[in-house]
Regions:
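Beta1-alpha1 glycine-rich phosphate/pyrophosphate-binding loop at the start
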Residues: 1-72, 160-181
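Mid-to-C-terminal Rossmann-like scaffold of FAD/NAD(P)H-dependent oxidoreductases
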Residues: 2-3, 22, 279-377
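A Rossmann-like FAD-binding core segment of flavoenzymes
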Residues: 26-28, 73-90, 97, 164-262
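Cysteine/selenocysteine-centered motifs that mediate thiol-based redox chemistry or coordinate metal-sulfur cofactors
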Residues: 135, 318, 389-407
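Glycine-rich dinucleotide-binding loop and its adjacent helix/turn
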Residues: 106-164
Length: 407
């Protein structure tokens, strides 16, 4: 009997199931998820927090979808151990699940930095539905929330909380918000937009200590160039990065570094065992955005269907979007010009519009579009195709329609 077992019920796992389709070769597929609710679209947690959507709306598959694909989803029951020799998975409830092929899709958890008091049970990450539930449960008595980390998730969390009527302070150690995707100009536009929404943005600021009783956070000490300050706050949300969930793989003797090590076919060092998503590591890279995980799922599904001739997984540049209504920001590739690079930019800061292209050898290697993202996908296509833009270089910054009209 051919059985596929997938550890994890997140977006990576379900993308593999979608790619496998109905006519897969397995007699049975078992998916083990430690959450008690069916798979949901984690990308939509920010709109959910902002009360702009519902859990039902972001739950893509019903029971019938799984049944017709011979998939058993085991909810609320994590994995205790993987026995590689016996090819068997043991769950926390005591179930023993034999497998022919095993996929680690265990995802990641919020990385909480070593801040005094950050181990308080009331401290929250922003990764799961339970994190959103924990925030919503506090709304009745919640006056002020502090979000630590102004990367993509931190900005989304801050806006979501503000839309729920909570006063929010957003702390970021770097002087540039979303500093992995934005330059200083784009950051200043984002900061102004957040301030217009009533969010107190503090760049160059770090948490020092959290204070509270056994039930709740009460204060947070922060430090910046201006010195130390104490804020009254009832909720602290850390959005300071992620840590891959690799413990099961480590215990099973599977090779790991920061993540579970895989090759270009998503295979681990152990035959019949694969990994993808935020728990895996390929070519010294780990993952936090969904686009590369979709690529991995497509490759893995083909390999599981015994198509060893499938195109191997390759790193490629992806488009990053800020998923906050009213804030349009797209970032692709290099947002600062390195050696040999040129920059073309235009801006209207009074309107919150900024466009920047980074070029090297007459090819686009980076794009920033803020406020007006109309042409970002066109730029992305040119960049992905490695197109020579020398003939339209002088017009390129004005977008596709202008270039086509002038041609």
């Amino acid at each position: 009997m051919q059985t596929l077992v997938i550890i994890g019920n997140g977006m990576a796992a379900n993308r593999v199931l979608e790619e496998l389709g109905i006519n897969h070769q397995y007699d049975a597929i078992q998916v083990i998820g430690d959450e008690h609710i069916p798979h949901y679209n984690r990308i939509m947690l920010s709109p959910l927090l902002a009360n702009e959507t519902t859990l039902e709306a972001i739950t893509p598959h019903d029971d019938a979808w799984y049944q017709e694909r011979r998939i058993e989803v085991i909810l609320g029951d994590g994995v205790k151990a993987v026995n590689v020799q016996a090819q068997q998975v043991e769950t926390n409830s005591g179930r023993a699940l034999p497998y022919s092929d095993l996929v680690f899709a265990t995802g990641s958890r919020s990385f909480i930095p070593p801040v005094d008091g950050a181990d308080h049970p009331a401290v929250i990450g922003f990764r799961t539905m339970s994190d959103v539930d924990a925030m919503v449960e506090k709304f009745g008595n919640l006056k002020h929330a502090t979000v630590i980390g102004a990367g993509l998730l931190g900005v989304e969390a801050a806006v979501g909380l503000k839309l729920r009527g909570v006063d929010v302070t957003l702390l970021h150690r770097n002087p540039v918000l979303m500093n992995r995707q934005l330059d200083a100009t784009a950051s200043s536009i984002l900061e102004a937009s957040l301030a217009e929404r009533g969010i107190d943005v503090r760049t160059g600021t770090s948490p020092v200590r959290l204070h509270g009783n056994s039930d709740a956070i009460q204060k947070i000490e922060i430090k910046s160039k201006r010195g130390e300050e104490t804020l009254d706050t009832q909720l602290v949300v850390f959005a300071t990065g992620i840590a891959p969930n690799i413990e099961l793989a480590v215990d099973a003797g599977i090779t790991t570094q920061r993540g579970i090590c895989v090759n270009e076919q998503m295979k681990t060092c152990t035959p019949g065992i694969y990994a993808l998503g935020e728990c895996c590591e390929f070519d010294n890279q780990t993952y936090g955005l969904v686009a590369p995980i979709w690529d991995q799922a497509k490759v893995l599904a083909a390999i599981l269907k015994s198509n060893d001739d499938t195109a191997p997984y390759k790193e490629r540049t992806h488009l990053t979007k800020l998923k906050v209504s009213g804030l349009d920001m797209h970032s692709i590739g290099e947002y600062e010009a390195s050696e040999g690079g040129d920059v073309i930019a235009t801006e209207d800061l009074s309107e919150g519009v900024y466009r920047k292209l980074v070029l090297r050898e007459n090819k686009i290697v980076g794009v920033l579009c803020v406020g007006d993202v109309t042409d970002s996908h066109w730029y992305y296509e040119l960049m992905s195709d490695g197109a020579d833009i020398s003939s339209i270089r002088d017009m390129l910054i004005f977008g596709q329609a202008y270039c086509e009209q002038a041609a």
